[in-house]
Swiss-Prot record:
UniProt keyword terms in alphabetical order: DNA-binding, Membrane, Metal-binding, Nucleus, Transcription, Transcription regulation, Transmembrane, Transmembrane helix, Zinc
GO cellular component terms given for this protein: nuclear membrane; nucleus
Localization of this protein: Nucleus membrane
DNA-binding region: 117-143
Annotated membrane topology: Multi-pass membrane protein
Name listed for the protein in its UniProt record: Uncharacterized transcriptional regulatory protein C417.09c
PROSITE patterns (alphabetical): ZN2_CY6_FUNGAL_2
Taxonomic path: Eukaryota, Fungi, Dikarya, Ascomycota, Taphrinomycotina
Species this protein is from: Schizosaccharomyces pombe (strain 972 / ATCC 24843) (Fission yeast)
GO biological process: DNA-templated transcription; positive regulation of transcription by RNA polymerase II
Top-level taxonomic group: Eukaryota
Chain segments annotated as transmembrane: 328-348, 601-621, 629-649
A Pfam family annotated for this UniProt entry: Zn_clus
Amino acid sequence: MHARMQPHEDRSRSGMSRSEAMELEDQLEEEERGGNVVVGSSSANANASTAETGKKSAGGSKPKRRRGERIPPSKRIRKAIAYVNKYASGCFGRVERRLVCTRSISRHSNQKLLDFCVECKKHKIKCVGNFPCGRCLKKGLECVIETPPRLLMNKDEISLNLQRLSHMETILSKLMPSMSLDLPSLEAKIAELSESLQTYPDKVLTDIELGSYQQVTLNETQTYYEDAGSNESFVARVHEIICQGREFQVQHKLTNKGNKTFEDILDPADNTVASLIHALPPKDITFYLLMTFWQFSSDNNHFYYNTKLFAAKVHHLFDDPTSFQSKDGGFVCMLLLSMAMGSLFSYIRHPEFLSDENHDRWTYPGSQFYQNAKLLFPKVISESSLETVQSFFLAGMYLSPTLAHEVVYMYFGIAMRAAVANGMHKKSANAQFSGDVAELRKRLFWSVYCMERKIGISLGRPESLVRSEIDIHFPEYRESLDSQNFIASFRTFTLAIKISLLTNKVYDMWYSSLHGKANLKAATIKEIVNEIEAWRQQLSPDLEIQNIGPDSRSYRGIVHLHLAYHIVRIAMGRPFLLHRLRERTMNSKTDEGARLLTDKLISYCYSSALHIVDLLVLLRMHKFLSVYSFMDYHSCHAASFIILVHLLINPSEQTIEQLNTAIDILNFVTDRFPLLKGSTDVITNLRAFAEQSEVYQSRLNATEPAYSTQVPFFPRDADYHNQINLQNLWNDENINASLEALFNDAKGFGFLLPADNFIFPSDDGDM
């Protein structure tokens, strides 16, 4: 056992006298120089150790420190720890060097709590003595002083953090001006966010069942649809749970037969329907107009109704007109609008009608039928049935050749909303009908959707129905429908829908990039161009223009299908054409990558403009060019603009000839329908202005154009759509970077803005 040390007046806080401490220091010094000092050993051992130490000292080691010489504090403490750990660990416990306080503890009463050892701090008593303290030394406890780590930061780091805090405060003040930046407000906001980010079990969310609510209210022509978020759907789910699976029927408030309906309040008598039936033309004239409509319009990539059933109902109307009452107002409205549509195309059978001197060119054919149909619009809207969709679809198609764009947009909007109200855009809503009825509803919806988007695009309006909400498939072949003579070809109709969706995709791409909603890259353009050309490859040989004759029933519809293909190509390349025109006008330069991409897509666009003119020349030659067709006139109008801009960029005699051909077609239409003369004058005035400019004259006299514009006239080869090879276009690594200037130039996308005199044509219809 270690002998207890006697008290001494000169003992330090460690319990050693000054002489004993000096002796301990001498022993540690000897041990450091290689000596073997053992406390409590015999004198013999001590002498032997001294002799051995003397030998090492004689060998050239450091001289022995003189008594009283002061050792640096850090060295003294380190040596004391080594001695305690080696010789006195049984009494004090082992001392950890990493926890040692490297300075003497103050004896003043106001010493910091940080300098207290763990045991003294635990018992809340004063820590007295050096290290180890007196209490730990007396009780044989391990004396540990916890020293928290200190974060050392230089001035640069502090300055950087202050700048970051200043910037963050500026951002917060801009984004959240109502929030105060004082400490209590920030702490309250953190608590609020922490509470909102709490995690909850997901099982309750997966157990919630939401379903759409669909009910047939009257018959196959009128349905009532509401999605899962509606009040009726919620009531239906509650009723289902209460009834515990038993059958139940929730009737819509407007179909309750026990009370007077809202429709009865609006139209208490059927005098209007009866008077309009009485004012119909004779049966032979009625069917003549209907047959004209079905032959020249209904087969052109649209579907309106089942013509076989419609014709049977018209026969019944003339045989027994008294059987039709106010509830048949939708059918009578459809009949009047169909006759108005037939009036637009009646001159195709008798073209001399438009050349008659007694013909008033300012009269719109079928306007009286249209005015009579408008009398039934309030009743048709209130029914919200399938006939509502068909009636306003026909009304929009009838006015689409005119410049009443806002009215047409409203008509198609009503048709679209009626289709959504009837659930025609949902697969589950159509599943309860028979195969033919479900297919007819599907075809009608796609026709309305494509035309509504076409008019919306031309006016710069957003989508009325988001594409992701539509889950019905494309039309499917049914022999019972497609074998009929007056039902649109299944293949042509499906292809028209697909090219219409591609046109929407192209316009959405440019519109999103203009408003910074998409990071447009050359890869995106490549993808869409490939989709367009993949659609072109789907056309079978019997749908090629050179393989069909003008006597074919579907000739006009197939020509419109090809017009749709070239329209979407024009939409793809027109921004690059405007960009090149601005470059030439301002004498600016572009890098090689941008020039390559621009040249290719200008050729892509310009080639399609020439093809559109060729197709319209064919229609005019075979007397199928319609004066009152939206597609015929506005596709020619769009192609004329492309050729005109191309003429300003690369003037040539060939381009002038092509532009004159397009303007001749426009004049042919406006001479017989003067309401469109304003749109034609825009082209002719721009042509006259361009021909008078000095830049135009100087480029016209140039020997070489900026790039090749040699595109053959019709008839073209079967693979003419592949003549513009774009495969090598996308290999240039600099293309993506060079597009930035083009996409940041908002003026280059002026074609997206509404224009009274320029409506970009659709791709899916006959009107």
